[in-house]
Amino acid sequence: MNLKKTLLMPQTAFEMQGKLTTKEQQFQAFWQSKRIYQKLHRQNKDKPQKILHDGPPYANGNIHVGHALNKILKDFVLRSWNLQGFGTVFIPGWDCHGLPIEHAVSKKDPQHYASLSLSEKRDLCKQFALSQIAIQKAQFQRLGLLNDFSKYYKTIDESFQQNELDLFLQAVKKDLIFQALKPTYWSPVSRTSLAEAEIEYKEVKTIGLYLTFTVVQSAVLNSGTKLLVWTTTPWTLPTNQAIAVHPQFEYLLFTYNNEQYVVLASLFESLKTKFGWTDAIQVQTISGSQLQNTTYKHCLYDKVNPVLLGNHVLCNEGTGLVHTSPAYGLDDFYLCKQNKLNEALVSLDEKGVFNDTLNDPVLTGLFYLKANDVIIERLKQHHNFVFSESFLHREPHDWRSKTPVIYRASKQLFIKTKSIQSKLKRQIKRVKFVNNKNKERLQEMLLQRAEWCISRQRVWGLPIPLIYADNQPLLDVTTIKYTIQQLKKYGIDSWFEKDINFFLNPKKIQPGVEYKKETDTLEVWFDSGSTYNVLISNKLNFPADLYLEGSDQYRGWFNSSASCGIIQTDQLPFKSLISHGFTLDEHGNKMSKSLGNVVDPLKLCDQYGADILRLWVTNVDWQVDNRIGDNIIKQIVEQYRRIRNSLLRFILGNLNHFNFGEMKDYRFALEDKIVIHKTNALVQELHQWLKQYNFLNCLKAINKFVLWLSGWYFEIIKDTLYCDAKTNPNRVAKQAVLNYIFTQLIGFLNIFIPHTAEDAWQNYLLPKKPVSVNLFAGPAMFKVANVKGLDRLHESFSAIKDRAYAAIEQARQNGVITKNNQVVLTLGVDSTSAIDPTSCKTFSSLAKRKPGKYNEWPQRN
C-alpha cells in the first residue's frame, strides 16, 4: 500500500509565485469590469461617510515615486476606513493651469506659439493638460488604487473656475484685495512673479562686495566720513535709496589711511583682518539712533540719500550698515515706505534687463548679472570700492526653470492675509494632527505671511475679473460681480475673445474714461487652494475629514487651502491634516536626473509588481523622508513571499475539502483556542494602529504573527491536517481555525497588497462569497472563554519553548542530534505551574515529552 497517497496534502490554485507583473493588471481590469468601486460605494452608502480630499497633482509629465507614495498612502487610508465600517468619498483631481504647461507647449515650436492669439495659446495649453491627465490617470491606476477614475475634477473645469471667481468676489466683499507696486519673487526666465511655494534654494557662488558711501551731513559724523556697506547684489546699487542701521546697535568710528569709516563695533576686528587694515585705529563709538538724519552721497550718481533706522539689520554678517533698495527687497520696501520714501526705482524689466529708468546708457540693455562687473569697475573709479570675495550662499531659484530668482517690484494684486490671521489661529486649534509639531508648522507658515500675491503675468490661468478705469483698478463689489456674471454666462474664455464693454456694468460706464481689462491671471495656488469647492458643489460633507500631502505643502497647498477656506467659508476646509516625507535614493540622497538616481515607480511595478511598491510604502515611517532602491525593494520581496506562502498559501492549501460552518459548531483543542484568542488580539491591535494611520506598526504586527504561526501552530498541526481523516473532528477544527485566521486578516492585507488579497480571495473555496475581496466586510469576532488563562498558558509555554529550542540548537551544533524529532523534552513542574506537562504534546513537534527534573537532558539512543 502506498501510504503517501493516503495523506491529505495541501491543494490550492493559489500559486507560490505571485506573478504580480502580469496578474495585477488582470485584477485591475476585473475590478473595472465588475464595477467594484461602484458596488462598494452602494454597499456603504448608509454608513457614516468619511472624505479624503485629493490635493491635485500637476498635469505635466509622468508620475514619480513621490506621487506613488502619496496616492498609495491615500489608498491605505480609504481602504482602512472601509474596513472600519465607514463609507468613503475620494474624488481625484488635477491642477491644470500655470507656467510649466505654457513652457511645455511653447517649446515645441516657439515661433509658431508666438504667432498665435491668446485664445489659441490657451486652447493648446488646455489640450496639453488634458493629454497629461490621461497619461497620469492610467499610471495611477497601475498602483492598484480603489478609486473611481471616471469621476475626477480639474482646475480648468468651467464649474470649478466659476466657484473660484466666487471666492475672488468674496475676498473683494471682505475688502481683502488690493493692488500695489511692491517687491515679490520674480523669475526673469518665466517673466512672472512667483509664490514662496514655487521657490527652491540652491547653494551657488555669490559675490560679497564691500563698498563705501560718503557722508554729506550728520549730527555726529564729519562730512566725508565713509559709511562701510556690504552687499551680495551689486546690480541693485544704482537704485540705492537709503542705508539702514539698527537703532540699538553700537557702531564704531575708526580711521585708516587718513580716512574715517563707520562700521558695526562688534564686526570691526573681523573686517580689519579681512581687509588687511591692521593699522586701523578706533576713534569712538556711536549708537545707531545717533545716525538718524545723516545723509550721504550715492556711490555711483550725484544724488543724496538718508540713513534710516531699521530693526531688521543683523549683527552677525556684513558691516551692520545695510544698502537699501526698495524695489528689490521686502525689508527695504517697508522701511522706505515707513519713512515716506514711496518711490521704488524699478530698473529692471520683466526679463531682468536694465531699462532706461536710471538714464544710464551704459547699463541700459544689460542683463542684471552681467551688470555686476560694470558697477564694480565704476565703484573703483569713484574710490568707493573696498573689497570683494566669492563665497557659497543659498539663493532662491525658480523650481520649474531651475534658474535664479530675484526680488523685483511690480504692480500686483495681493490678499491681506494679515486680516484673517486671528481667525486662522482660532480654526487651527480645532484641527487634528498626528504630530503636534505640524500644527505649529502650519500656524507659523500662515502667520508669517502678511500679504499673498495672487496675480501672475501669464496667459494660461484663470483671468482676474478686474477692470481698470484710467489705469485705476475698479475693486468695487458691483463692478466685479457684474463681470463675473458675464464670465459665468458666456464662458471663461470670453474674457480673451470679447471687447471690454461686454464686461462693464452699463450703470458704471462714465464718458471720457478709458477702460481696459486685467491681463494677469490668478496664481495656481489660488486655483488649488479653492479645490474644497468640489466637495461643496457635490453636496458632500464639509469640511473634509482629511487632507494628506507631502511636507512641502505647509507653505503650498495646506497654506493656500486654509486661507481660501477662511475667506470663503469662515472655516478651514479640513478636520485633520497629515503630511508625509520625501523619497530619497537608497543612499539617502535627493533624487536627480543629473545624478542618475531617480527611481521610477512604473518600472518598479513592471519589474516587481505594484504590491511590492505598496509593501515598501507600508514598511516606511511615512512622516519622515525615506529611502528606496533595488536593494531595499529586494528585502521587501522576501517579506512579501513570507506573507504569500507562509500564511496565505498554507491556509488556502489546507482548506481543501473543508465544509464551512459556524465557529461554535467545532470542538477546539487548547492550541486552537490560543490561536483564535491571539488572532482576535491582533485584529484589535491592527484597528488601533489604523486609527492612528500607523501602517508600519500594522505590518510589523502582521509579520510577527505570521512568524509565530508558521514557527509553532502551523508546525504542530501538520500531522493532523495531513494524516487524520477528512472528517476527523480535531482536523476539521483546525481547518476552522485556519479559515478564521484567513477571514480575519484578508481585509487588512487588502489594504496593503490588494492584488495579492484578490488572488487569494478568488482561490478561497467559500461557496457563497462576495465577487471581490473589496466587498468582503469580514466576519464577526469569535470569542473564546478563559482569555486570561490562555494568555498565562501561552506565556508559560513560550518561555519553555524558547529555552528548549535554545538547548536543542546547542545540541545540534555539538552533534548530539541532527533533527528535532530525535529530542525528548523533560519538563519539571510543580503545583504552581501554569502549564500541564502532559499537554505539552499540543505545543511542540518534538518526538517525545515526559515530566521530570529541570535541566535533565536525555542521552542520545
Curated annotation (Swiss-Prot):
Motif 'HIGH' region: chain residues: 57-67
Catalytic activity: tRNA(Ile) + L-isoleucine + ATP = L-isoleucyl-tRNA(Ile) + AMP + diphosphate
Pfam families, alphabetized: Anticodon_1, tRNA-synt_1
EC code: 6.1.1.5
Location relative to the cell: Cytoplasm
Chain ranges for the short sequence motif 'KMSKS' region as given in the UniProt record: 590-594
BP GO annotations: isoleucyl-tRNA aminoacylation
Main location: cytoplasm
Function: Catalyzes the attachment of isoleucine to tRNA(Ile). As IleRS can inadvertently accommodate and process structurally similar amino acids such as valine, to avoid such errors it has two additional distinct tRNA(Ile)-dependent editing activities. One activity is designated as 'pretransfer' editing and involves the hydrolysis of activated Val-AMP. The other activity is designated 'posttransfer' editing and involves deacylation of mischarged Val-tRNA(Ile).
UniProt remark on domains: IleRS has two distinct active sites: one for aminoacylation and one for editing. The misactivated valine is translocated from the active site to the editing site, which sterically excludes the correctly activated isoleucine. The single editing site contains two valyl binding pockets, one specific for each substrate (Val-AMP or Val-tRNA(Ile)).
Recorded family membership: Belongs to the class-I aminoacyl-tRNA synthetase family. IleS type 1 subfamily.
Name this polypeptide is given: Isoleucine--tRNA ligase
Organism encoding this protein: Mycoplasma pneumoniae (strain ATCC 29342 / M129 / Subtype 1)
